[in-house]
C-alpha cells in the first residue's frame, strides 16, 4: 500500500502551528466552494495534546507592537497580529478585554528609555498617549507614576482558549492531528520529506513542512542541516496577587531595558479578575530543568509599579519557558526567524513574546509565502 502523502505537515501544536492549521482550514473552505481539491495537512506534536508549553503559559496579553524594534518582522507581525487577534476573538466568541496598557518609569534613567519607546511607537505606527498624574489616576488609580505612556490597543485574553478554539476549527475541517509523536529524523526525497517519528515506529510523508516546534525548533532545524540557530530556554514565572483585584484595571508595565530580559515583570488583570505579576527571565541549563525562584523579586517589582501590595498577597502561579535566541546578558533584541531550508521546509525559530499576539499574522505571512505552491495543488 502506498503511504499517504500530505501536502503540508506542521511540526508543533503550540499557538503558531495551530494558527497555521486554522488559516489553512479557511483556505480549504474556499477551495470547496469552487470545487477545488483541499490541501491535506497533518499537525504533529510530541506531547499528548495541544499548547502544552509556552502557548498556554504566558500573560495572555494582546500586544500593541510598541515594544518591538522598528523595521523587524517582530514589529510588523505584532502590529498586524494585534488587529487580527481581536478579529479572531470576535469571530470565534473568545472572551477578551481591550483595556489598554500603561507603561511607567520606575527610576530616573527610565526617562531616556521613555523617549525610545515613543520613537518605536511612531516608527511602528502604534497609537499612544503620553499621560501625567491626573490621567494616570483615572486609568490606573494605584499606579506609582507621574508620567507614562498609555497604549489603548493592548488587551488581554486567555491564551489556552484561543489555542483550543483554533484547534477545534482545524479539526472540524478535516485537518489531522498526531500526538505523542516526536520527530527524530527527516529524509528529503524528490517529492518532499519523510518525517521519522518515535524511534522509527511511524513515518509521515509531506511535500511541504513547517517547523513550529517552539523550544525545540533549533533541534528540528538541525535535522535538516540548518545549524546556525540555538534556542536558549528562558524560564518565566508568575505569581498571583490574591484578594486585591482593585489594584490593577488592565496592564501596568515597566519601561523595558531593551535587552535579553524582554518586556519586564509586569502586572496583568486577567479575565477572571485575578492579577498576575511576572514573568521574570531565568536562563536554564537545559530545556527540561525544573526551577523555582523566591517571591522577593516579584514583591519588589509589584511594589515599584503599584501602591498597596503586601508580601502576604502573593502566591505562586505558574511558569513557562520561552524560546530565546540570545543568551543571558546579551544586549541584542533578536527578531523572529522565518527561514526556508531546504526548499519547501520552513523554520520558525525564536518565536517568543510577542509570539502569541503575532501568531495569526505569522500564519498569514507563511501561507502567503506558500500561496503559489499551494495553489498548484
Question: Which residues does each predicted region cover?
Answer:
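Glycine-rich FAD pyrophosphate-binding loop
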Residues: 25-56
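Active-site substrate-recognition segment that forms the wall
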Residues: 94-96, 212-343
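Short hydrophobic core segments
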Residues: 9-11, 204-216, 363
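Short beta-strand to alpha-helix junction loop
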Residues: 70-80, 104-113, 149-168, 290-293, ...
Amino acid at each position: 500500500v502506498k503511504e499517504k502523502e500530505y501536502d503540508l505537515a506542521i511540526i508543533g501544536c503550540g499557538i503558531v502551528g495551530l494558527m497555521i492549521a486554522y488559516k489553512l482550514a479557511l483556505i480549504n473552505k474556499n477551495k470547496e466552494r469552487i470545487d477545488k481539491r483541499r490541501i491535506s495537512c497533518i499537525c504533529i506534536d510530541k506531547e499528548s495534546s495541544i499548547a502544552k508549553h509556552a502557548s498556554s503559559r504566558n500573560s495572555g496579553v494582546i500586544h500593541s507592537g510598541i515594544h518591538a524594534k522598528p523595521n523587524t518582522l517582530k514589529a510588523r507581525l505584532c502590529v498586524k497580529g494585534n488587529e487580527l487577534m481581536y478579529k479572531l476573538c470576535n469571530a470565534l466568541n473568545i472572551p477578551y478585554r481591550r483595556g489598554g496598557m500603561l507603561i511607567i518609569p520606575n527610576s530616573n534613567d527610565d526617562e531616556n528609555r521613555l523617549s525610545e519607546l515613543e520613537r518605536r511607537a511612531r516608527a511602528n505606527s502604534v497609537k499612544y498617549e503620553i499621560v501625567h498624574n491626573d490621567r494616570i489616576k483615572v486609568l490606573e488609580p494605584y499606579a506609582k507614576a507621574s508620567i507614562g505612556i498609555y497604549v489603548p490597543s493592548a488587551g488581554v485574553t486567555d491564551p489556552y482558549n484561543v489555542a483550543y478554539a483554533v484547534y477545534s476549527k482545524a479539526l472540524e475541517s478535516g485537518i489531522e492531528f498526531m500526538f505523542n509523536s516526536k520527530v527524530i529524523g527527516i529524509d528529503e526525497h524528490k517529492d518532499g520529506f519523510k518525517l521519522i517519528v518515535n524511534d522509527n515506529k511511524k513515518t509521515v510523508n509531506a511535500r511541504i513542512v513547517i517547523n513550529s516546534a517552539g523550544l525545540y525548533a533549533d533541534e528540528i532545524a538541525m535535522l535538516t542541516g540548518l545549524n546556525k540557530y540555538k534556542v536558549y530556554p528562558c524560564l518565566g514565572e508568575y505569581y498571583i496577587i490574591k484578594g486585591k483585584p482593585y489594584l490593577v484595571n488592565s496592564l501596568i508595565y515597566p519601561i523595558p531595558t531593551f535587552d535579553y530580559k524582554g518586556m519586564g515583570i509586569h502586572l496583568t488583570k486577567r479575565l477572571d479578575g485575578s492579577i498576575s505579576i511576572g514573568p521574570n527571565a531565568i536562563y536554564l541549563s537545559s530545556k527540561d530543568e525544573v526551577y523555582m525562584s523566591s517571591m522577593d523579586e516579584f514583591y519588589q517589582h509589584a511594589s515599584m509599579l503599584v501602591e498597596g501590595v503586601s508580601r502576604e498577597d502573593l502566591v505562586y502561579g505558574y511558569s513557562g519557558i520561552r524560546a530565546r535566541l540570545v543568551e543571558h546578558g546579551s544586549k541584542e533584541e533578536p527578531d523572529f526567524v522565518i527561514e526556508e531550508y531546504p526548499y519547501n521546509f520552513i523554520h520558525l525559530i525564536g518565536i517568543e513574546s510577542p509570539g502569541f499576539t503575532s501568531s495569526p499574522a505569522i500564519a498569514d505571512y507563511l501561507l502567503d509565502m506558500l500561496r503559489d505552491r499551494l495553489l498548484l495543488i
